[in-house]
Amino acid sequence: MIYNILIDGLCNIKKLTAARELFNSLPLKGLQPNIWTYTIMIRGLCKEGLIDEACDLLEKMDGNGCSPNDRTYNTLIQGLLQWNETSKAIEFVKIMVGKGFLANASTASMLIDLLSADPGDKVLKELLQ
């Protein structure tokens, strides 16, 4: 989808408002964002520190009949961890694992770093097993 490339490019050059407008215009053009479109927007929002909006978008995604996949969850979790939103990240790891998905190498590495900072965290230990 050409719109995915455009939205990704806009996010990469920090034109998030334009990316958001293009994303929101898709249904008006008779197009539905797909899993990659959502993941691209979530990554763009996370890069700019708009964590709550990224979390909301993932929830809207699921509500719009486009179920997140492991890449979508890993993208959001990595964004949360980069902005020190550890408790939210753990919540989404639990949801991701509950849906049968696994953390990718980068997410697992970030979780291991968290565990090394707090070796007594039972939740993190459980998630990494």
Protein language model annotation of sequence segments:
Residues 3-4, 8, 19, 24, ...:
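Pentatricopeptide repeat
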Residues 22, 57, 92, 126-127:
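Alpha-helical solenoid repeat scaffolds, predominantly canonical TPR units
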Residues 117-127:
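Alpha-helical linker/edge segments of TPR/alpha-solenoid repeat scaffolds
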